[in-house]
Curated annotation (Swiss-Prot):
NCBIfam families: sfsA. Belongs to the SfsA family. InterPro entries: SfsA, SfsA_C, SfsA_N. It comes from Citrobacter koseri (strain ATCC BAA-895 / CDC 4225-83 / SGSC4696). Gene3D superfamilies: 2.40.50.580, 3.40.1350.60. This is Sugar fermentation stimulation protein homolog. The gene is sfsA. GO terms for molecular function: DNA binding.
Length: 234
């Protein structure tokens, strides 16, 4: 995926009200960006860090600029726009970059499923193969070389794991894919120090047939692609 038009660079002043961030451009102009991330953004929003933002052609938007990437003072790149995790996953599946998810003829998005009537991110279908249900999670929380999910207690994420276990019990493929959007992360682990219940459910889900995939995105201000499998520790 290529950014078009190219991203623009600025320096972060502050993030506030969850959805907004003030930045200053190289020529000294102050802008307010839309922040498409409602999470804690731990380590992703330090004042003084470099941010890369896009600009919408929609003149009716109150905040036409969107915060896409953070570049930390150590040089790490982080994709803070949570919408990209699904977009990159879809692109990677369609281009058959993810070997475990290749060979399907049909891809559907946002399909209702399960007893709790969740919406699955993707469902893959093919003749003579069980349907494959895929839930995508964005990973940006980094501690040393490890990436962790979630960065806050997630009841919604817990529900998704329960639904995936039900899907696996019915004979379908059930997959949770952790999309690592932080260049410094080289391994993945559930954040039991933040949400012990989610970590416990993830282990239970694997034991009950849910497949766990971890793929890292190659990030730059020019574009991104999801392609590198990472090891995990549950």
């Amino acid at each position: 995926m290529q950014f078009s038009p190219p991203l623009q660079r600025a320096t972060l002043i502050q993030r506030y009200k969850r959805f907004l961030a003030d930045v200053i451009t190289p020529d000294g102009t102050e802008l307010t960006l839309h922040c498409p991330n409602t999470g804690a953004m731990t380590g992703c929003a330090t004042p003084g860090d470099t941010v890369w933002y896009s600009t919408s052609e929609n003149t009716k938007r109150k905040y036409p600029h969107t915060w896409e990437l953070t570049q930390t003072r150590t040089g790490a790149l982080i994709c803070v726009n949570t919408l990209w995790a699904n977009r990159l996953t879809k692109e990677a599946i369609q281009n058959e970059q993810l070997s475990e998810l290749s060979g399907y003829s049909l891809l559907k998005s946002e399909v209702k499923y399960g007893a709790e009537r969740s919406r699955i991110d993707f469902m893959l279908q093919a003749d003579s193969r069980p349907d494959c249900y895929i839930e995508v999670k964005s990973v940006t929380l980094a501690e040393q070389e490890y990436g962790y999910f979630p960065d806050a207690v997630t009841l919604r994420g817990q529900k998704h794991l329960r639904e995936l276990m039900s899907v696996a019990a019915e004979g379908h493929r059930a997959v949770v894919l952790f999309a690592v959007l932080h260049s410094a992360i080289t391994r993945f682990s559930p954040a039991r120090h933040i949400d012990a219940k989610y970590a416990q459910l993830l282990i239970e889900a694997q034991l009950k047939g849910v497949e766990i995939l971890v793929y890292k995105a190659e990030l730059s201000a020019e574009g991104m692609t999801l392609k590198e499998p990472l090891p995990m520790t549950l």
